[in-house]
């Protein structure tokens, strides 16, 4: 799953990921995961802009297509990451739109429940909550002035 906001705090969580039936975290080093993968995913949008010299909109469009595909047609029992209003799970404030693992079926989604989170995961999720709440406060201020 990829938790949180699209941006520098985005957190690719491999805790429950598997590769050919093996836990993904058993196939990589902690150093590579923490110091390479997480920062690379978090900076992906800006890296695309820098490499291509223009917007990463095509990448965002592909993500939107995948998002709608899974939502409408289902994710076949597999987890997908979607930005959805939180129901309060995992300490994410209720109503905050947040990327989290879901399973899609019949045009609906259900947040994956009861995952055990370690402190590393909780810290990254908390950083995303702070970033999104800061963005929401900025928007609220702009709207109040309008």
Regions found by a protein language model. Give the residues of each.
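Long, compositionally biased stretches enriched for glycine and/or charged residues
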Residues: 1-146
């Amino acid at each position: 799953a990829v938790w949180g906001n699209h941006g520098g705090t985005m957190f690719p969580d491999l805790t429950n990921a598997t590769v050919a039936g093996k836990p993904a975290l058993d196939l990589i080093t902690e150093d590579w995961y923490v110091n390479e993968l997480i920062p690379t995913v978090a900076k992906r949008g800006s890296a695309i802009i820098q490499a291509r010299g223009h917007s990463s909109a095509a990448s965002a469009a592909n993500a939107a297509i995948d998002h709608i595909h899974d939502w409408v047609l289902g994710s076949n029992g597999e987890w997908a990451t979607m930005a959805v209003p939180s129901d309060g799970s995992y300490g994410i404030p209720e109503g905050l739109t947040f990327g989290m693992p879901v399973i899609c079926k019949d045009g609906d989604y259900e947040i994956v429940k009861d995952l055990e989170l370690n402190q590393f995961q909780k810290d990254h999720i908390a950083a995303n909550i702070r970033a999104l709440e800061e963005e929401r406060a900025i928007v609220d201020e702009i709207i109040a002035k309008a």
